[in-house]
C-alpha cells in the first residue's frame, strides 16, 4: 500500500505463489494503483531485475530463495528467517535449520536508521517484537528497570494470523472474546524481543510473554511491566 503510489519507487514485479495469475485487486481491493495487473509466479530471474525486493514468505522459504538472488539486489525480508542471532534459539522456536542473521531493521532503535540505509540485506522485525521492544527500550536503555524479569501481555488483531480461513478466527468465535495462546515461553517472538533488548541493555534480558488474540481486525496493545532499579 505504501509503495503503490510512492514517488521514489516504481513497482516492476509482484509475485504471489498461491495466487499467481490472479488479478491483484481481486485479492487486495485497496491496491487500486495496480488495477488490471496480475500476480506473477516467483522467479529468481525476474527478482534479479529489481533494485530492491521485499520478501513476504512462510518461515524457511526466504532462506531457500535468497540463494538464487543476485548480490546486487537489495532485500528486505518480512519473514523471520534472518532475525535471530542465536542458532540455538532459531532451532528451538522454529524447528528448522538456521540460515544466519541480517541487520535487524527497527529504525527507531539507537544507530539503526543509518545502518539500515547502508545495508544490502535487512530483516524486518516481527509484529509483537516491534511493539514490545519499542515500549521497553527507553526504560531498558536508561537502566531504570530490572531486565531479568520483564512481563508482557499483548493483544493482537486477527490479521496477524494471516488470510487462511480458520475456525477460531471466524466471527462467531472471535467476537466478544479474548484468547491467550502460545504462552509459557513458547511464542516465536520471545527470543527476538530478548535479543533486541539485550543489544540495548548490554546485559541479559528475560521476557515472560503472553500473547492474546483480540476481537479487532488489526493492531497490537502491549502492556510491559518490570521491577524498577530505582531506590525508594
Feature annotation, model-predicted:
Residues 1-183:
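N-terminal Rossmann-like NAD(P) cofactor-binding subdomain of oxidoreductases
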